[in-house]
Amino acid sequence: MEQFHATTIFAIHHNGKAAMAGDGQVTFGNAVVMKHTAKKVRRLFQGKVLAGFAGSVADAFTLFEMFEGKLEEFNGNLPRAAVELAKEWRSDKVLRRLEAMLIVMDERHLLLVSGTGEVIEPDDGILAIGSGGNYALAAGRALKQYAGDQLSAKEIAKAALEIAANICVYTNDHIIVEEL
């Protein structure tokens, strides 16, 4: 899969809770940090769904709007809305050029949605995307496995992002965490 710089999004289902975290850095090109406090994790569908993006900010806003429309159309059915978004995203000539990836979740489902048509639900209840995604994913899996009985979903999400921010130059430590 394509890597998008300037962000890290991490999401986890753990002990009956769902949490998603994202950093606040927006990078212009490969050299200039333009913003430190962007909000890349949002609540959708009356606060029942969390969505986070990696990639172009303008493209992400387009995808958030489209995804929220699909959630409304399918009455909050997250898997169906994600599949329909992925189908439309992949088949439309203009949308196909959008450079972003989404993680979407509710209390039961956690999904990665990409413009190549993938809708992936992880086996372990953890997903991460963006330039620091691999670092956050490794940290989150370790935290869940070795300290999961002592940490909440929200604490794991925040710690995974903090670790990624210490490694990835495109990820900062201005972290937003949302929980369901």
UniProtKB/Swiss-Prot annotation:
It catalyses: ATP-dependent cleavage of peptide bonds with broad specificity. Its EC number is 3.4.25.2. GO terms for cellular component: HslUV protease complex; proteasome core complex. Keywords: Allosteric enzyme, Cytoplasm, Hydrolase, Metal-binding, Protease, Sodium, Threonine protease. Na(+) binds at residues 165, 168, 171. GO terms for biological process: proteolysis involved in protein catabolic process. It is found in: Cytoplasm. Pfam families: Proteasome. This is ATP-dependent protease subunit HslV. It comes from Geobacillus sp. (strain WCH70). The lineage of its organism: Bacteria, Bacillati, Bacillota, Bacilli, Bacillales.
